[in-house]
């Protein structure tokens, strides 16, 4: 049985809550001192992992739509993508404010150059910014065929973001590896499309 438009609306509400409630918990945990000895790092990692989870969830929508034969599921993709951008922005802000500090924000440029994993992160964020700004129907109509070409860059983010995470951790743990494997599986599912996109 196919999902109805009303059921999709309730699903979207649930997804909004699933993406928002971790932010409530983050503020609570930070205010109550629930993080470990290095709360700045913990907050950065938490926001980064949330962005990655939502990135993978965004990429999962199309396979689920086709495998489950639920065409209306595609309506959830944009909200997941926008939440991914929101959490990626929180990740960038947490690094800028908690790692560098307001007085040292001028060092951000040199940090991006001297630390390649940060370069991958900022490139990913800039792509997500472009996708978020053009995610609305008005932008889609204005860009025409170029809209799809632009939004295919989400696949580049799916490559760069897991590498950014793997590269940033000092001690390799299963978590970043699992995110990378998830991205590989979702990209492999799109092998033909990726090959065509790469050739254009």
Curated annotation (Swiss-Prot):
Keyword Protein biosynthesis: no
UniProt keyword annotations, A-Z: Cell inner membrane, Cell membrane, Electron transport, Flavoprotein, FMN, Heme, Iron, Membrane, Metal-binding, Transmembrane, Transmembrane helix, Transport
Topology class, membrane: Multi-pass membrane protein
Primary residence: membrane
One protein family per Pfam: Ferric_reduct
GO cellular component: plasma membrane
Signal peptide extent: none
Membrane-spanning intervals of the chain: 8-28, 54-74, 79-99, 116-136, 153-173
Protein location: Cell inner membrane
Molecular function via GO: electron transfer activity; FMN binding; heme binding; metal ion binding; oxidoreductase activity, acting on diphenols and related substances as donors
InterPro entries: Fe3_Rdtase_TM_dom, MsrQ-like
UniProt cofactor note: Binds 1 FMN per subunit. Binds 1 heme b (iron(II)-protoporphyrin IX) group per subunit.
Record keyword Iron present: yes
GO terms for biological process, alphabetical: protein repair
Cofactor: FMN; heme b
Subunit field text: Heterodimer of a catalytic subunit (MsrP) and a heme-binding subunit (MsrQ).
Function: Part of the MsrPQ system that repairs oxidized periplasmic proteins containing methionine sulfoxide residues (Met-O), using respiratory chain electrons. Thus protects these proteins from oxidative-stress damage caused by reactive species of oxygen and chlorine generated by the host defense mechanisms. MsrPQ is essential for the maintenance of envelope integrity under bleach stress, rescuing a wide series of structurally unrelated periplasmic proteins from methionine oxidation.
Recorded family membership: Belongs to the MsrQ family.
Name by which UniProt lists this protein: Protein-methionine-sulfoxide reductase heme-binding subunit MsrQ
Source organism per UniProt: Cronobacter sakazakii (strain ATCC BAA-894) (Enterobacter sakazakii)
Gene designation: msrQ
